[in-house]
């Protein structure tokens, strides 16, 4: 089976880098303690059962018998302990959030692992799949420099597919794991992850049958209507239920005048999200109303009771805010200039950037678009902080601990870590609310706290929230059982099969 991954990842070190183009490959190789059903309830995987202590301060996992890593080493509780304490807690970009309460892992025997927590962590059971907290082989990493270990790009896991080959600029080949612990699986002999930079060529590969699957909107939204008329192809929006995402603008508050709330709010008012939805996303998604995806409505954490930037007199408001901030128009009609870093993950983001340039010019902000390769873009924004406005789309994970904490907590201003608080937002009141919500076991009380947090963010406007993203997968009709759960392409294709 050939799947398209766009763009090519810089590494397969899934435990240390969280870019969205890594999991479609890495989750074929690495597994987690649990997986999830369509209702997002945890189901057995490397763990067969678990018990949460009455005080919420420990979780005891019984581990599966007969599981071996791709190098032949048996899977034991020592691998769980090493993965959590020596790799994930130290190197995973989101460990300061997901594993903040983890103090240790007890291993009373080879098939029992006990996660010890300083405080209850109600979000943790939603983050134990291979996508978020994968389990690695202790013997591969022990005594080595974790980030320089060769298995970063030749990974060794317990999953249904083994790493085969990486031809840089072309493809990664994964081979069937003949010793996989699920009898008879996987069905496919190989998965080829192809890297095709050009959007038209990606679409052509699917239309001719050269490729069988493209997830995470690797196909341009503009091409989807044509794809739907092709008898070889079909599309689905399933498989993204645990991957809510927002298209946003990150505003560097270290670069005046973006340090002024009025300027950030003016930018938010200046943008017509309905135009982006129509002309860039071709109707897929919905206008974002605030800092959390509307997918969180199903669990009671989302609210639209926040400052509304999508109002009829938005341009008048934007101009008044900019005037009030002491930023008059010059002779050319512009108030000030800024650079916009264009998202490198697809051509639709360039189209969005071109619209943003037009929209902000109306209120006197002169945007210069800057497009670079993915590695340069990420380094410029998250390591060098050499940017004014950035145009990412941000995965919000399975809990507001992902969607809010990582993006807005003061503690998440972490130089060199991607997709965290690079806007330098710092609000002690907000921090206190999120830290309380993170440890609150009562769901209703958490919901009240998150509503307040969203209202504060919408007022402070550290980011501009554009589109509640709807991902789309395109697949060949001869490919079956490719999307079998709410993690979609970020879980293994163990049951996928191709008609001959």
Predicted feature residues:
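Ligand/substrate-recognition segments at binding pockets and active sites
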Residues: 3, 168, 297, 323-397, ...
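N-terminal lobe/hinge region of extracytoplasmic solute-binding protein
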Residues: 4-54, 85, 154-158
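Gly/Pro-rich hinge or "lid" segments in bacterial periplasmic/extracellular proteins
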Residues: 41, 129-186, 190, 320
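Surface-exposed binding/hinge segments that line
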Residues: 51, 62, 96-141, 165
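Extracellular/periplasmic solute-recognition and catalytic clefts
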Residues: 104-105, 164-175, 192-255, 278, ...
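Extracytoplasmic/peripheral linker and loop segments enriched in polar/acidic and small residues
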Residues: 277, 311, 366-378, 383-385, ...
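Structural transition elements
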Residues: 287-325, 344-351
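Long beta-strand-rich cores associated with HINT superfamily self-processing modules
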Residues: 473-500
